[in-house]
Each structure stands twice: as C-alpha cells, then as structure tokens.
From Swiss-Prot:
MF annotations from Gene Ontology: ATP binding; ATP hydrolysis activity; DNA binding; excinuclease ABC activity
Species whose genome carries this gene: Leifsonia xyli subsp. xyli (strain CTCB07)
Matches recorded under PANTHER family: UVRABC SYSTEM PROTEIN B (PTHR24029:SF0)
Entry protein name: UvrABC system protein B
Subcellular localization, as worded in the UniProt entry: Cytoplasm
Domain note: The beta-hairpin motif is involved in DNA binding.
GO terms for biological process, alphabetical: nucleotide-excision repair; SOS response
C-alpha cells in the first residue's frame, strides 16, 4: 500500500544568498540531477559551504533527500545546519539509538557466551520513529543519517498497515482502539504516562506516540470519535484541536497476528531441519541449546506477538528468501529520493565494510547453536544492495575517492569560498631543528591570539612533544584516541576560546572540523608515506588552516614525496583560482566568524545541567539557582528574568516527569518568587 504523503515545497530560509562558487555549483548539480545523471561528485574545498549548497540543491530539485555522514557527531552538526536552513520542512536525524551496545556473541576458545546488553537513548529512539513517521506522511523530508540506515528495520508495508488512522466522526469502539494500540506494542499504564504508553479514563483514551513529545487525547461518545486534542503530557493543557491524526506503531518491527503465525510456522520448519543437521554432525549440545532458545522465543511470539531479539527472525516475518536483503530505512523513502553522501572518501568505504563485520560474529553464533541460520539475514546491506536501492547520488568531499571519481558522470567543483578566504600557504621545512622552529612559530601565533594544530605520526612522539612544549611555557593539550567524543568537543572549544594555544594529536584531520582561530597547522614527518600522510589525509589536514585569513601549513620533511607533491599542487591550484576570483570581483577576504558552539557541546552541557538539577542531592540548597539571584533582582534585566522563569518552568516539569516531586516543589516556590519580582518590576515601570 503506497502511503498518501503531504506535499509541501522545500524552502531555504537564510539571511545569506549563494555566493562564491555556490551559485554555479547549485545550478550545475541541479542540471545534472534533472538530466538524469546517476552519480555526481561535488569536489568542494574546505569551508566553501557544501552543506548550504546541499540545502539549496534540495530546494532546486524538490525531492526527499537522504544525507549520509560517517559518524554521529558530524550527522548531528549537519542536522542542525539543515534545520536552520530549512525551518519549514521536516529535517530528521536517524542514527543508532544505543548509548551503549554489546552485541550477542560467543567466544569458542573460552566457551563464553556474551548476552546482548544495551542502553537505549530514548530521545534518539524518538527521533528514529519521527523519521519513519515523516517519510510515510510527507514529501518535504531531509533525513541526516549514519550507516544505521542500511541496517535491518521492519518492513515499511507492515509498519504502514499497522498504523491507526483516526478522524472526528469515525465509528470505532473504545475496546477496539485499546486492542489496536496493544497490538502496536503500546503499553497501557494509567499511572506512569510517558512515551509509548496510553491510559484510559471512561470514554477518553490518551496516548503518547513514540515519535511525539505531546500526547493525543481521543474523546469518544459511544462508538464514535467526538474530538481529538493535542495536549501537554504532564500538565494536561490542551495545545490544539485536530480533525484527523494517524498513530504509527511503537516498534519498527510491527507485524499483524496473521504474519506472526505464518512466521512461527516457517521458524519451526527451519528449526526442525537445523536440529536434524546438528544431530547428524554429532553436535548434541548445540542442538539442545538451539531447541530451548528457539522454542522459548516461539512461545513468546504466540502469547504476545513479540519476543526479545525478534529482529533475528526478521527473514521469516518479512517472508524473505534465504540471502535476500533485509528491509531498511531506504524502503521508507519515495521512489524518487535523492542521496547525498558527505565526506564520501570516508563514508563510501564505511558502508561497504559493515556487512562482513556483522556476518563474522553471527556465523559463530549459528555454528554453536545460539541462533538459527536465518539470523544471518538480519544484517546490514551489502554495497551492491545499497546501490540497487538508491537512485541518484551526489558525493561530497574535498578529496573524493577513486570509486566516486570512477563512476561519476561528472565532477562539479566548488573552490571559491563565500568569505573570499584562500587556501593556506604551504611551506616545506627541513626536519633538522624542526622543534625549535615550531616553538618559535607557536610563540609568534600566541602573541597574535591565534591557535596552532600540530600533527605527529606516533602517540609517543605526540606525548613527548606535548611535555616539551609545556615545559617551554606553551599552553598546550594533547588529543588522543582515549579521549571520548564529548571531551574532544570540550578540548576543541577550549582551543577556540584561548584556554590553550596549541593542540597536538596524531590524526587531527577530522573531516568537518571547523576551527577558524587556527592560523598554523604543523605537520611533522610529512615525508613518511602511509595512511596519515597520504595525499587525501594531507589535503584534509591542510584544510584545517583554510578558515583563517593568515592560515599557513608547515610541512617538516627532508624529501618531497608523491603525496606531498599532489597535496601541494592541488592546494596551489585552488589558491590560484581563489585569488584570481577575488581580484576580478574586488573581494577582500574576511575571517570566518563562527559561534564557539557545537551541537554536541550544547547537548553535553544541557545533559550535564539537567542531571545536576534532577539529582537534587544537595539538600542544603534553599534554592536550586542561588547564583542566578545572588546579585539581587536589580541585577537581573527583564528579558533575563523572563528567560530564567521559562527555564525554571521547564526544569520543574522535567523534575515532575522524573517523579522528583520535592525538587519540583522547590522549583515551583522559586518560580513563584521570580514571578512576584517580575510583577513588581512592571509596577515600578522598569518594563516597556
């Protein structure tokens, strides 16, 4: 069944207009896509605004779009940018919802079985459901995703078939609705009303869909829907009235009772065949293990239509043939969707590598009787299967890989930056006396309040260099593999803010990293050929200095390698084009002004603040916000006071939602005092 999707145009809302190479790139990309070219490469230099170009391209072609990034942090950054550029359209974020994930595994050498263990991030899970909801209900959708989009997901047809469409005046019984919601894996809970649950009070049913922040109230009169309301789940405040709404399942692995019964039949057939095979091979322990585990899962499915690890039976539930590719997020898109692969030189190999890593683990589980062979078909797509499911693809990169360049119908260049900034000057210096030279360059930059990145080849060298620079009085930090993602964000923010001047690391290229304050990138051992000193890595590293007007790259080397030569020639070519464009158009290069903030930084800060507030461990605090009021009410402007009231109100509701009622009461009292102060300011005429 093909869903009916709301049609609304994509519209970019921005105070800026395309500039530099952007207008030409947008027009050429749109022209090639419209002409039907299957694969197109956008070779965009660092800092030329490839994300903005993508948004304008989507506006030009008016097609649902999947944007692929190679890690969660970059995906979050891209989603944030697209939401700012396309505020009136659905920009969704689809990544793995696990904060922690230990997959099911077996180690034959030690006879150790590791149970699946995971911690699910409820908010990311909501965003995943929001993605599928948007894809099946509207066309103006941009989904920013990682490789999660190629992993198994329930069939779109089953998901859509399980949906409940509600309309005012519709004839439907209360008990019938309750049964439908339970079949969709919603839990009835009249006490703890939260996402994925519903409650019943007389002829009124209230439900919070897994993809929504607000609740839905269904008021019935007999067997007829009398009214539908959107309401705040905690306060019960009615936010809006609607005439029609659709409720999608609480799980992507939705299946009708008939489908489950059919699947149970084929699972039992496969189990019988596999047991015969194992017993014939003399693997009696494995056979008994498989019989017990599978029979338990079958009983669970017979009783409640679901079982833990049901995704391992997805081939049976979907009715797929052995070896057939699983359903995934790509199946939820309309047929004419566009794919944009960001940092394609990294993301393309990543997509291709996912299948084999998953298969090797499951192969061991199957061989030792922990899973049926059909569990192998709950897997990510192979590369060729991915290509079959996507249509036209745009590959974005400052350094496109051989694969993209080989299959592309054409390469579109975006070299000129909107800011007029040119690629950095590259100097090759001898290794003799390199540390003294580097120290001198660092001190010169520090005096100008500029920052420096230093990249080395080994962990030991990075540590020793950091110690040496620190002893020489340089404010320096060392970024290494053991630093977690959020701490890495903090380090980069501290670098930009001037807490320290130099960051030393091994692999600092970090595609998509924006550091406008960095005016010098020093590459030690630049002539040591290898992954970290390939032409691609060198160009990416050089790009870290391309966001500063006085950016320079110093390569310390005694030999000019082929990789160095390619990187220098490509950078020089781009620089010449940029300088010529600036001269012809009278453009004076402007420094890139970017807020010292990042979506992961913001999320981390909010998460820490919320945890601190909700913990409520310091019982001695009379007010949870003494520092905000320590200067007296006169120290607070009206706007700040109103903002504080809004923040505290949100914290109070969050505390109540977490059942932290004592904290919520303290916040309520604090709110009451602040509102009284605000009223006094109004009476005194301090508010306009």
């Amino acid at each position: 069944m093909e869903p009916t999707r709301l049609v609304r145009p994509f519209e970019v809302v921005s105070e800026y207009q395309p500039s530099g190479d952007q207008p030409k790139a947008i027009a050429e990309l749109a022209g090639r896509i419209t002409a039907g070219e299957t694969d197109v490469v956008l070779l965009g230099a660092t800092g030329t605004g490839k994300s903005a170009t993508t948004a304008w391209l989507v506006e030009a072609v008016q097609r649902p779009t999947l944007v692929l990034a190679h890690n969660k942090t970059l995906a979050a950054q891209l989603a944030n940018e697209f939401r700012e550029l396309l505020p009136n359209n659905a920009v969704e974020y689809f990544v793995s919802y696990y904060d922690y994930y230990q997959p099911e595994a077996y180690v034959p050498q030690t006879d150790t079985f590791i149970e699946k263990d995971s911690s699910i991030n409820a908010e990311v899970e909501r965003l995943r459901h929001s993605t599928t909801n948007s894809l099946l209900s509207r066309r103006d959708v941009v989904v920013v995703s990682t490789v999660s989009c190629i992993y198994g997901l329930g069939a779109a047809e089953e998901y859509l078939e399980a949906m409940v469409a509600l309309q005012v005046g519709q004839n439907v019984g209360r008990d019938q609705l309750i049964r439908r919601f339970v079949a969709m894996q919603y839990e009835r809970n009249d006490i703890d009303f939260s996402r994925g649950k519903f409650r019943v009070r007389g002829d009124t049913i209230e439900i919070i869909p897994v993809y929504e922040e607000h609740a839905l109230r269904i008021e019935l009169f007999g067997d007829e829907i009398e009214a539908l309301y959107s309401l705040h789940p905690l306060t019960g405040e009615v936010l809006a009235r609607t005439d029609a709404v659709s409720v999608f399942p609480a799980t992507h692995y939705a299946a009708s009772p008939a489908t489950i019964q059919r699947a149970i039949g084929t699972i039992q057939t496969e189990l019988h065949d596999r047991l015969v095979e194992l017993e014939r091979e003399g693997k009696l322990l494995e056979a008994q293990r498989l019989r017990m585990r599978t029979q338990f899962d079958i009983e669970m499915m017979e009783q409640i239509g679901f079982c833990s690890g049901i995704e391992n039976y997805s081939r049976h539930i979907d009715g797929r043939a052995p070896g057939e590719a699983p359903h995934c997020l790509l199946d939820y898109f309309p047929d004419d969707f566009l794919v944009v692969i960001d940092e394609s030189h990294v993301t393309v190999p990543q997509i291709g590598a996912m299948y084999e890593g998953d298969a090797s683990r499951k192969r061991t589980l199957v061989e030792h009787g922990f899973r049926l062979p059909s569990a192998m078909d709950n897997r990510p797509l192979r590369w060729n299967e991915f290509k079959e499911r996507v249509g036209q693809t745009v590959y974005l990169s400052a350094t496109p890989g051989q694969y993209e360049l080989g299959i592309a119908d054409g390469v579109v260049e975006q070299i000129i930056r909107p800011t007029g900034l040119v690629d950095p000057q590259i100097l090759v210096k001898p290794t003799k006396g390199q540390i003294d030279d580097l120290l001198e360059e660092i001190r010169a930059r520090a005096e100008r309040d500029e920052r420096v990145l230093v990249t080395t080849l080994t962990k030991k060298m990075a540590e020793e260099l950091t110690d040496f620079l620190a002893e020489a009085g340089v404010k320096v930090r060392y970024l290494h593999a053991d630093v977690d993602t959020l701490r890495r964000v903090e380090l980069l923010t501290e670098l930009r803010s001037g807490v320290f001047d130099v960051l030393v690391g091994i692999n600092l290229l970090r595609e998509g990293l924006d550091l406008p304050e960095v005016s010098l990138v020093a590459i030690l051992d630049a002539d040591k050929e290898g992954f970290l000193r390939s032409s691609t890595s060198l160009i990416q590293t050089i790009g870290r200095a391309a966001r500063n007007v006085s950016g320079e790259v110093h390569m310390y080397a005694d030999v000019l390698t082929d990789s160095m030569k390619k990187a220098i020639e490509e950078t020089s070519r781009r620089s010449e084009l940029q300088v010529e464009y600036n001269r012809a158009n009278g453009i004076d290069p402007q420094p890139l002004r970017k807020r010292i903030a990042d979506i992961t930084d913001i999320l981390a800060r909010e998460e820490a603040d919320t945890a601190k507030i909700l913990a409520g461990r310091d019982q001695k605090r009379k007010s949870p916000t003494p520092s905000l009021r320590s200067g007296g009410i006169a120290a607070q402007g009206a706007a700040e006071l109103e903002s504080l009231i809004a923040d505290l109100n949100a914290q109070m509701l969050a505390a109540a939602g977490e059942l932290k009622f004592e904290l919520a009461a303290r916040l309520r009292d604090e709110l009451s005092d602040l509102k009284r102060d605000l009223r006094q300011m109004e009476k005194a005429g301090h508010l306009s």
